[in-house]
């Protein structure tokens, strides 16, 4: 049996980022063989990551990066189980690594990015932190030529909301202001005509039921439905919204003044669409006490 020294444990900790006891145990089981200990820890990391994969990861961060010439940008979301881990330096380092990978490979989706080199670091982070970690999604906006337009981004100070926007005409300041507006107001689409037909149908049915309950004449009911639907479409369409920094003008008017047009936007909010598990703290404590 090899003697496991403090310097060996220290080296393994530095190479893996894992805790002292995990490293000491791995070296003991590997009979002091550093490389075998690392290999065993990597295998254990994969098993641990697989076991935790079913746990809901709905916290985390969003990050963006824009090319120097402004013709390309990327936004990603990386999830953890708790907000505490989302502020951990190791988690943030992995998120930055994922961002750089997504920026470098302009065609890769999440699966391709993981297969290309992120899955190993992800599993190692799961092993180190003890939570499920996911690269959830990635999106990119670009122009073939920088003269065609600009791509800009805005990330809210808490790193929970990020917006990527592509603009023809205007400048970076305008693009960033509109991205900030999108982060705050959360429009569904750019233009009224972009609202999906199924959404319009659903809203129309709701307004119809509400209006008919009023007992008003049919012609009045139809006008009520039409008016409410127009109002809804305006509220969810970016161009028709009052500009958040100057509510006296609409976003479309701001763009017209600058001779600019919005091509596309992407808005990510951490955890949106993920069904979070409801924790019963009292029941959890009771279970631990009875166990």
PLM feature spans:
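N-terminal assembly/interaction segments in proteins that build large macromolecular machines
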Residues: 2-291
């Amino acid at each position: 049996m090899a003697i496991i020294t403090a310097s060996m444990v220290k080296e393994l900790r530095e190479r893996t980022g894992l805790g002292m006891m995990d490293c000491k145990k791995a070296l003991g089981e590997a009979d002091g063989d550093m490389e075998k200990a690392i290999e065993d820890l990597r295998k254990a990391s994969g098993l641990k990551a697989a076991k935790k994969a079913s746990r809901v990861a709905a916290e985390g961060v969003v990050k963006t990066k824009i090319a120097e010439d402004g013709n390309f940008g990327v936004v990603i979301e990386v999830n953890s189980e708790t907000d505490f881990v989302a502020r951990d330096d190791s988690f943030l380092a992995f998120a930055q690594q994922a961002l750089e990978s997504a920026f470098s490979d302009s065609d890769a989706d999440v699966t391709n990015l993981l297969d290309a080199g992120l899955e190993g670091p992800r599993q190692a982070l799961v092993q180190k932190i003890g939570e499920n970690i996911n690269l959830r999604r990635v999106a990119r906006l670009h122009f073939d030529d920088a003269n065609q337009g600009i791509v800009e981004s805005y990330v809210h100070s808490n790193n929970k909301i990020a917006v990527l926007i592509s603009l023809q005409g205007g400048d970076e300041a305008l693009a960033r202001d509109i991205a900030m507006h999108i982060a705050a107001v959360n429009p569904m689409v750019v233009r009224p005509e972009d609202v999906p037909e199924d959404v319009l149908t659903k809203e129309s049915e709701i307004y119809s039921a509400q209006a008919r309950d009023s007992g008003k004449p049919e012609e009045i009911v139809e006008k009520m439905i039409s008016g409410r639907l127009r109002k809804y479409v305006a509220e969810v369409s970016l161009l028709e919204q009052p500009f958040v920094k100057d509510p006296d003008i609409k976003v479309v008017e701001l763009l017209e003044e600058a001779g600019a047009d919005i091509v596309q936007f992407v808005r990510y909010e951490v955890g949106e669409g993920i069904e979070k598990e409801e924790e019963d703290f009292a029941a959890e404590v009771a279970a631990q006490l009875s166990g």
